[in-house]
Protein backbone atom coordinates (compact mmCIF):
# COMPACT_ATOMS: atom_id res chain seq x y z
CA UNK A 1 0.00 0.00 0.00
CA UNK A 2 2.81 2.42 0.86
CA UNK A 3 4.67 1.37 -2.29
CA UNK A 4 1.62 2.22 -4.45
CA UNK A 5 1.24 5.58 -2.72
CA UNK A 6 4.89 6.43 -3.38
CA UNK A 7 4.64 5.33 -7.05
CA UNK A 8 1.57 7.49 -7.66
CA UNK A 9 3.01 10.42 -5.69
CA UNK A 10 6.16 10.30 -7.86
CA UNK A 11 3.92 10.04 -10.95
CA UNK A 12 2.13 13.24 -9.92
CA UNK A 13 5.47 15.01 -9.43
CA UNK A 14 6.69 13.83 -12.85
CA UNK A 15 3.45 15.11 -14.43
CA UNK A 16 3.93 18.50 -12.82
CA UNK A 17 7.60 18.75 -13.79
CA UNK A 18 6.82 17.91 -17.44
CA UNK A 19 3.80 20.25 -17.66
CA UNK A 20 1.44 17.32 -18.28
CA UNK A 21 -2.25 17.73 -17.50
CA UNK A 22 -3.10 14.69 -15.41
CA UNK A 23 -5.76 13.43 -13.03
CA UNK A 24 -5.16 11.63 -9.77
CA UNK A 25 -3.70 8.15 -9.55
CA UNK A 26 -1.24 8.35 -12.43
CA UNK A 27 1.96 6.29 -12.48
CA UNK A 28 4.88 7.48 -14.58
CA UNK A 29 7.94 5.22 -14.41
CA UNK A 30 11.62 6.10 -14.34
CA UNK A 31 13.28 7.57 -17.41
CA UNK A 32 10.04 8.56 -19.14
CA UNK A 33 10.87 11.40 -21.54
CA UNK A 34 8.20 13.94 -22.47
CA UNK A 35 8.39 16.61 -25.17
CA UNK A 36 5.59 19.21 -25.40
CA UNK A 37 4.15 18.08 -22.07
CA UNK A 38 1.61 20.92 -22.15
CA UNK A 39 -0.10 19.05 -25.04
CA UNK A 40 -0.36 15.77 -23.09
CA UNK A 41 -3.45 14.80 -21.09
CA UNK A 42 -3.48 11.74 -18.83
CA UNK A 43 -6.81 10.78 -17.30
CA UNK A 44 -7.24 8.64 -14.16
CA UNK A 45 -5.43 5.38 -13.42
CA UNK A 46 -2.93 5.68 -16.27
CA UNK A 47 0.35 3.76 -16.00
CA UNK A 48 3.31 4.69 -18.16
CA UNK A 49 6.03 2.14 -17.53
CA UNK A 50 9.76 3.01 -17.43
CA UNK A 51 11.79 4.18 -20.42
CA UNK A 52 8.88 5.42 -22.56
CA UNK A 53 9.08 8.46 -24.84
CA UNK A 54 6.08 10.77 -25.35
CA UNK A 55 6.81 13.28 -28.11
CA UNK A 56 3.47 15.09 -28.33
CA UNK A 57 2.26 16.90 -31.40
CA UNK A 58 -0.59 19.36 -30.89
CA UNK A 59 -2.56 16.78 -28.87
CA UNK A 60 -1.77 13.55 -27.02
CA UNK A 61 -4.58 12.10 -24.90
CA UNK A 62 -4.39 8.91 -22.83
CA UNK A 63 -7.72 7.74 -21.39
CA UNK A 64 -8.79 6.08 -18.13
CA UNK A 65 -7.18 2.80 -17.04
CA UNK A 66 -4.57 2.65 -19.82
CA UNK A 67 -1.32 0.77 -19.27
CA UNK A 68 1.61 1.64 -21.55
CA UNK A 69 4.41 -0.93 -21.35
CA UNK A 70 8.13 -0.30 -21.08
CA UNK A 71 10.31 1.16 -23.84
CA UNK A 72 7.46 2.47 -26.01
CA UNK A 73 7.75 5.56 -28.21
CA UNK A 74 4.69 7.71 -28.95
CA UNK A 75 5.11 10.54 -31.47
CA UNK A 76 2.66 13.09 -32.87
CA UNK A 77 -1.09 13.54 -32.45
CA UNK A 78 -2.33 10.45 -30.63
CA UNK A 79 -5.57 9.60 -28.85
CA UNK A 80 -5.63 6.43 -26.76
CA UNK A 81 -9.14 5.68 -25.54
CA UNK A 82 -10.03 4.06 -22.18
CA UNK A 83 -8.77 0.67 -20.98
CA UNK A 84 -6.09 0.14 -23.62
CA UNK A 85 -3.20 -2.22 -22.86
CA UNK A 86 0.02 -1.64 -24.79
CA UNK A 87 2.85 -4.15 -24.43
CA UNK A 88 6.57 -3.27 -24.44
CA UNK A 89 8.87 -2.10 -27.25
CA UNK A 90 6.36 -0.50 -29.64
CA UNK A 91 6.60 2.46 -32.02
CA UNK A 92 3.35 4.42 -32.34
CA UNK A 93 3.51 7.60 -34.45
CA UNK A 94 1.02 9.73 -36.34
CA UNK A 95 3.92 11.19 -38.33
CA UNK A 96 6.59 9.87 -40.67
CA UNK A 97 9.96 11.20 -41.83
CA UNK A 98 10.31 13.38 -44.92
CA UNK A 99 12.79 12.04 -47.47
CA UNK A 100 12.02 13.84 -50.75
CA UNK A 101 15.10 16.11 -50.79
CA UNK A 102 18.01 13.85 -51.74
CA UNK A 103 20.51 16.65 -51.08
CA UNK A 104 19.77 16.44 -47.32
CA UNK A 105 20.04 13.58 -44.86
CA UNK A 106 16.61 12.20 -43.93
CA UNK A 107 17.22 13.13 -40.29
CA UNK A 108 17.42 16.82 -41.30
CA UNK A 109 14.20 16.91 -43.35
CA UNK A 110 11.66 16.87 -40.53
CA UNK A 111 8.43 14.92 -40.32
CA UNK A 112 4.99 15.06 -41.92
CA UNK A 113 1.54 13.62 -41.23
CA UNK A 114 0.81 11.11 -44.00
CA UNK A 115 -3.04 11.42 -43.86
CA UNK A 116 -3.39 8.22 -45.90
CA UNK A 117 -6.61 7.36 -44.05
CA UNK A 118 -8.22 10.82 -43.93
CA UNK A 119 -7.86 11.45 -40.17
CA UNK A 120 -6.09 14.18 -38.22
CA UNK A 121 -4.63 11.85 -35.58
CA UNK A 122 -3.71 8.28 -34.71
CA UNK A 123 -6.43 6.73 -32.50
CA UNK A 124 -6.47 3.47 -30.54
CA UNK A 125 -10.00 2.39 -29.61
CA UNK A 126 -11.34 1.52 -26.19
CA UNK A 127 -10.45 -1.88 -24.75
CA UNK A 128 -7.82 -2.71 -27.37
CA UNK A 129 -4.59 -4.59 -26.79
CA UNK A 130 -1.37 -3.82 -28.65
CA UNK A 131 1.17 -6.66 -28.42
CA UNK A 132 4.95 -6.29 -28.36
CA UNK A 133 7.26 -4.98 -31.12
CA UNK A 134 4.33 -3.42 -33.00
CA UNK A 135 4.69 -0.41 -35.31
CA UNK A 136 1.64 1.78 -35.92
CA UNK A 137 2.43 4.65 -38.29
CA UNK A 138 0.27 7.37 -39.83
CA UNK A 139 -3.24 8.64 -39.27
CA UNK A 140 -4.48 5.16 -38.35
CA UNK A 141 -7.67 4.48 -36.41
CA UNK A 142 -7.74 1.18 -34.55
CA UNK A 143 -11.27 0.21 -33.55
CA UNK A 144 -12.69 -0.81 -30.20
CA UNK A 145 -11.64 -4.11 -28.59
CA UNK A 146 -9.02 -4.93 -31.21
CA UNK A 147 -5.94 -7.10 -30.79
CA UNK A 148 -2.77 -6.17 -32.66
CA UNK A 149 -0.49 -9.23 -32.61
CA UNK A 150 3.22 -9.09 -31.80
CA UNK A 151 5.56 -7.87 -34.57
CA UNK A 152 2.73 -6.34 -36.64
CA UNK A 153 3.06 -3.21 -38.80
CA UNK A 154 -0.17 -1.18 -39.05
CA UNK A 155 -0.51 1.62 -41.63
CA UNK A 156 -4.26 1.34 -42.40
CA UNK A 157 -7.42 1.58 -40.28
CA UNK A 158 -8.55 -1.49 -38.31
CA UNK A 159 -12.33 -1.96 -37.75
CA UNK A 160 -13.86 -2.66 -34.32
CA UNK A 161 -13.57 -6.17 -32.81
CA UNK A 162 -10.75 -7.48 -35.01
CA UNK A 163 -7.47 -9.30 -34.57
CA UNK A 164 -4.72 -8.26 -37.00
CA UNK A 165 -1.25 -9.68 -37.54
CA UNK A 166 1.64 -9.55 -39.98
CA UNK A 167 3.66 -7.16 -42.11
CA UNK A 168 1.66 -5.42 -43.42
CA UNK A 169 -1.18 -5.99 -40.95
CA UNK A 170 -4.04 -8.14 -42.17
CA UNK A 171 -7.22 -9.16 -40.39
CA UNK A 172 -7.08 -12.76 -39.15
CA UNK A 173 -10.14 -12.82 -36.85
CA UNK A 174 -13.31 -10.82 -36.38
CA UNK A 175 -15.86 -10.97 -33.59
CA UNK A 176 -19.33 -11.98 -34.80
CA UNK A 177 -21.87 -10.07 -32.73
CA UNK A 178 -24.71 -12.46 -33.70
CA UNK A 179 -22.94 -15.71 -32.72
CA UNK A 180 -20.88 -14.03 -29.97
CA UNK A 181 -17.73 -15.80 -31.18
CA UNK A 182 -14.39 -14.86 -32.70
CA UNK A 183 -14.26 -16.19 -36.25
CA UNK A 184 -11.10 -16.92 -38.24
CA UNK A 185 -10.90 -15.26 -41.63
CA UNK A 186 -9.49 -16.87 -44.74
Task: Mark where each language-model region is.
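Glycine-centered loop/turn positions within well-structured domains
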Residues: 60, 152, 160-162, 170
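Short helix N-cap motif at coil->helix boundaries in the Bergerat
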Residues: 156
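Extended, small-residue-rich solenoid/repeat segments and analogous flexible loops
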Residues: 1-41, 45
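A general secondary-structure boundary signal
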Residues: 24-25, 64, 69, 160-161
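Flexible, glycine/small-residue-enriched loop-and-beta-strand segment within the central core
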Residues: 35-42, 47-138, 167-168, 174-176
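Conserved beta-strand-loop-alpha-helix hinge in the C-terminal portion
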Residues: 162-164, 168-184
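Conserved catalytic segment of ABC-fold P-loop ATPases
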Residues: 143-146, 159-161
Amino acid sequence: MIKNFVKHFLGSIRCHLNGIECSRVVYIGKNVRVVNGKNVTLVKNVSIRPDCDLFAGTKMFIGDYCDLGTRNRFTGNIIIENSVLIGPDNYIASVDHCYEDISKPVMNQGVYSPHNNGHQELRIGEGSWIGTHVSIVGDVHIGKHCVIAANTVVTRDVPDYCVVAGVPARMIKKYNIETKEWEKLK
